[in-house]
């Protein structure tokens, strides 16, 4: 099984979502096929370190 390919656009949304305390499980639920490790890679700066957080979440992104 292969992970979903992580893009710069996804990384920007992930950064904003985590800044807003959105749980990893909601992020990986939104991006089906993406695992917690890729979210952690983005947040630790191992993937897309120079990409800033998105300005807003997608309109269909899960929120509390």
Features from the language model and the residues they span:
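Basic, low-complexity segments
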Residues: 1-3, 41, 62
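Short acidic, glycine/serine/threonine-rich helix-capping segments at coil-helix boundaries
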Residues: 2-4, 27-29
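Short, amphipathic alpha-helical "recognition" segments used to contact nucleic acids or chromatin
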Residues: 4-22
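Residues within well-ordered alpha-helical secondary structure of globular protein domains
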Residues: 17-20, 33, 45
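Residues that mark the N-terminal boundary/hinge immediately upstream of a DNA-recognition element
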Residues: 23-24, 35
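Short, basic interhelical loop/turn and adjoining N-cap
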Residues: 29-42
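Catalytic-site neighborhood detector that most strongly recognizes the C-terminal catalytic loop/helix
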Residues: 42-49
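Short Lys/Arg-enriched helix C-cap and helix-to-coil transition segments
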Residues: 49-64
